[in-house]
């Protein structure tokens, strides 16, 4: 899975998705969609990756190949996003996280332990799942999450849903540069394709949930190791990124918190060569020995 040669963006997405098993679990009046990558025959430890707001499992397109085959990698489309239906309560983080935790248990078993990793809004979900399932979750890692420390500057995005063709693609590039990726050279066709697919399927209003205080409430309840990463150039955190890192370090002195140089908000995509080794290092600390 580590051989991402110069395929077309669609070929990369299709290849990685084809290597997963698709699951559906209950979510409100509908279903939650999951993908599981497993090359171990069910023996490797489980890590669940939670994407960001207005996202899908595709936010982890450069992370999944780095974790398989050492892990069983479980990625949902979070409730109200991607292919998943709306949750019973679309405003309460812990209610949504309960749906997520129940989905994990339905797929890998109620007695299976797992690590959770969340990007942006997914960090709130990861922290809440960790607080709700202290006997099941081995560690919580948050990447570029809001709700920690002082608010950053507001990021204004252009509307795209009414646009078509090249104008739509160009506007996605503008928005990716403003919000997600600091280095314009990293805004490639794959990033734009993922952004387009994700945004047109976004229904859950995640920013309010991320800023609700739920992530800090959950972090205060954690009984497991906490890790964190923020891009030095994370636009939603700007100019408060270092302050967020300092806030979390002060609140959780034993947490492993990293500031990623030259990196924007979507760190796992823009700086995969930096994020993936750090993430593997963090996960290794809680990897089961048998």
Language model regions located:
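Active-site loop/oxyanion-hole signature of alpha/beta-hydrolase fold enzymes
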Residues: 61, 74-117, 277
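Alpha/beta-hydrolase fold catalytic core
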Residues: 1-47, 69-71, 108-109, 253-256, ...
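Conserved alpha/beta-hydrolase catalytic His-Asp/Glu region
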Residues: 151-152, 167-224
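Conserved HGGG/HGGXW glycine-rich cap/lid loop of the alpha/beta-hydrolase fold
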Residues: 35-83
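Gly/Ala-rich beta-loop-alpha elbow adjacent to hydrolase catalytic centers
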Residues: 118, 122, 126
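Flexible "cap/lid" loop of the alpha/beta hydrolase fold
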Residues: 127-131, 138-168
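Conserved loop-alpha-helix segment in the C-terminal half of the alpha/beta-hydrolase fold
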Residues: 230-263
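Catalytic histidine-centered segment of alpha/beta-hydrolase-like enzymes
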Residues: 263-272, 276
């Amino acid at each position: 899975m580590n051989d991402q040669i110069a395929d077309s963006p669609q070929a990369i997405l299709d290849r990685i998705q084809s290597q997963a098993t698709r699951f559906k679990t209950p979510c409100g009046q509908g279903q939650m969609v999951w993908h599981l990558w497993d090359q171990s025959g069910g023996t490797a430890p489980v890590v669940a990756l939670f994407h960001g707001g207005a996202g899908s499992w595709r936010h982890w397109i450069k992370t999944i190949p780095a974790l398989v085959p050492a892990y069983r990698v479980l990625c949902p489309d979070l409730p109200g996003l991607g292919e998943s239906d709306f949750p019973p309560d679309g405003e309460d983080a812990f209610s949504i996280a309960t749906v997520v935790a129940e989905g994990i248990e339905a797929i890998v078993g109620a007695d299976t332990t797992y690590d959770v990793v969340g990007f942006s809004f997914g960090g709130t979900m990861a922290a809440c799942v960790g607080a709700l399932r202290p006997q099941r979750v081995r560690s919580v890692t948050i990447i570029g999450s809001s709700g920690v420390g002082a608010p950053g500057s507001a990021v204004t995005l252009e509307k795209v849903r009414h646009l078509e063709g090249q104008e739509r693609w160009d506007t996605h590039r503008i928005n990716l540069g403003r919000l997600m990726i600091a280095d314009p050279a990293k805004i490639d066709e794959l990033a734009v394709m993922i952004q387009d697919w994700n945004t047109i399927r976004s229904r859950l209003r995640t920013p309010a949930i991320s800023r609700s205080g739920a992530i800090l409430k959950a972090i205060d309840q954690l009984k497991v190791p906490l890790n964190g990463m923020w891009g030095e150039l994370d636009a939603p955190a700007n100019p408060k990124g270092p302050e967020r890192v300092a806030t979390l370090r002060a609140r959780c002195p034993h947490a492993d918190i990293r500031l990623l140089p030259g990196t924007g908000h979507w760190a796992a995509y823009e700086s995969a060569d930096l994020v993936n080794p750090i993430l593997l290092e963090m996960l290794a600390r809680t990897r089961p020995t048998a």
